């Protein structure tokens, strides 16, 4: 069968989707909001009927219901699978003590990263509502991770829980720092808040990378993904690689493995 797979990554802030062909190449991509208030529905009108939909959803039941409504409106009865983290899948072994507690987005991202950088030790930093770090050995063993507030959440927390600090978005903060990246210390409150929270992100990444390289006594590639990756990258002093399709690529691998298993049983 050559029908494509529809891949859906429902994150905490928005929903990304892609159509993957038989070679797992992402041939169509897009994004939309959790609700119609967050933007237009995806335009799937010109897409061929996929073999099925493979979904990572960390956004909850309301988003799951919205996805079902959208899928049924375009392709009634389309098979769909919402993935869960496993102990082992697509060459990656889950080091969590309770494997299914690992977020499905992080699991798919690990699978995508292992395939994208074969034979390399990796530290994967993803910048969304939360900043997550995953330590992935070259043999596919996920040995653990870290979760911290994302850049936007840090700034929003300070603005919300203090009387005199502003509440800044990442767009505002990025603009404020555009001409001040060379200066480690800022001379007004909005820029000080923006830079302080950004440096907190960069400091976390650099400390984690150094600790991991020391523990493993081997080179570790730092991989950055997510909406704030460009801003955090400018504050880093480490070499790094950008990859923005790890989750969708991982979903493509999961879908392909399942299709191969089904074909083998036929």
UniProtKB/Swiss-Prot annotation:
Subcellular location: Cytoplasm
Cofactor(s) needed by this chain: NH4(+); K(+)
Residues engaged in binding ATP: 9-16, 129
GO biological process, one term: coenzyme A biosynthetic process
Annotated residues for binding of substrate: 96, 103-106, 189
Record bears the keyword Kinase: yes
Keywords on record: ATP-binding, Coenzyme A biosynthesis, Cytoplasm, Kinase, Nucleotide-binding, Potassium, Transferase
Molecular function terms, GO-annotated: ATP binding; pantothenate kinase activity
Cofactor note: A monovalent cation. Ammonium or potassium.
A Pfam family that the UniProt record links to this protein: Pan_kinase
Substrates-to-products reaction catalysed: (R)-pantothenate + ATP = (R)-4'-phosphopantothenate + ADP + H(+)
Catalytic site: 105
UniProt-listed Enzyme Commission number(s): 2.7.1.33
This protein's pathway: Cofactor biosynthesis; coenzyme A biosynthesis; CoA from (R)-pantothenate: step 1/5
Keyword Repeat applies: no
GO cellular component: cytoplasm
HAMAP family, sorted: Pantothen_kinase_3
Quaternary organization: Homodimer.
Role played: Catalyzes the phosphorylation of pantothenate (Pan), the first step in CoA biosynthesis.
Family to which this protein belongs: Belongs to the type III pantothenate kinase family.
Name of the protein this chain belongs to: Type III pantothenate kinase
